[in-house]
Amino acid sequence: MARHPRWTLSQVTELFEKPLLELLFEAQQIHRQHFDPKQIQVSTLLSIKTGACPEDCKYCPQSSRYKTGLEAERLMEVEQVLESARKAKNAGSTRFCMGAAWKNPRERDMPYLEQIVQGVKAMGLETCMTLGMLNESQAQRLANAGLDYYNHNLDTSPEFYGNIITTRTYQERLDTLEKVREAGIKVCSGGIVGLGETVNDRAGLLLQLANLPTPPESVPINMLVKVKGTPLADNDDVDAFDFIRTIAVARIMMPTSYVRLSAGREQMNEQTQAMCFMAGANSIFYGCKLLTTPNPAEDKDLQLFRKLGLNPQQTRVLAGDNEQQQRLEQTLMTPDTDDYYNAAAL
């Protein structure tokens, strides 16, 4: 049973129709009621099993149905994953997300996945996985291993969904989110802007997310990364203001959720990213690649953080952990005032 006011489609549509500056002002006010506006949660995403996915998501280069030039790779060894997690922590990430390109994990994969979760948790990092659909037993096993978050995006509205994916139903996605929640794992779920959807579809996606019995703790909003060989490779570019508007509406509708500026940042300039942060985005993926698509280099993100006076959320540093992490955090928390970018002047 819902424990929060339910949104209606007309209410969401009204938000999308608001003048942009009024919308941004409202979103920023709500954001400041629940979060420190200078804090950004930083995550790193690693593909632990790449390509050869049997599903037909039209945006995805990892689908075996499309010729994108992506070479399939087997599951990474546990120690390889843990080494990547160490590097992510040393670079400033507080959450380590792991994705596998399959429809759902098999039972024989579960001990491997549990071992990875336990190993990453032991470093003091939050853990997140995106593995496709889960059954009740798998969700509970991951919870028992210590998994903090599970990502399973809804992608778009229920009405537009069938134009993008046919190998998994919308209800199956909702069912997986329910199983994850019942197992005690926090939910990470969002969608993609630029699939060819209408504004009403964007409203419908956010309506589904906000009206879950408990809204997702983390809401990634992706800008479509067009990959040659996928059916959406020739889609029109997303207007930057339309994307910023979607971020702002997500913040207003889900005031206590982290809204993550996810895929597509590589094609955004600094001004667009700054306006997304003004609109209420307070989380990013950090690192040069998101699964298989480009992402801004770490140094570029650090420069942007310094210009905007943003600080990465503090990680839980274990006793005796290396000092590089602490030095990096101190560097990031010292704004470059000579080059400060005044986001409020946008």
Curated annotation (Swiss-Prot):
Q: Binding residues for [2Fe-2S] cluster, per the UniProt record? A: C97, C128, C188, R260
Task: Please indicate if the UniProt record lists S-adenosyl-L-methionine as a keyword.
Answer: yes
The name this protein carries in UniProt is: Biotin synthase
Q: What does this protein do?
A: Catalyzes the conversion of dethiobiotin (DTB) to biotin by the insertion of a sulfur atom into dethiobiotin via a radical-based mechanism.
Cofactors: [4Fe-4S] cluster; [2Fe-2S] cluster
Q: Could you tell me what reaction this enzyme catalyses?
A: (4R,5S)-dethiobiotin + (sulfur carrier)-SH + 2 reduced [2Fe-2S]-[ferredoxin] + 2 S-adenosyl-L-methionine = (sulfur carrier)-H + biotin + 2 5'-deoxyadenosine + 2 L-methionine + 2 oxidized [2Fe-2S]-[ferredoxin]
The root-end lineage is: Bacteria, Pseudomonadati, Pseudomonadota, Gammaproteobacteria, Enterobacterales
What's the source species for this entry? Salmonella arizonae (strain ATCC BAA-731 / CDC346-86 / RSK2980)
Q: Does the keyword Transferase apply?
A: yes
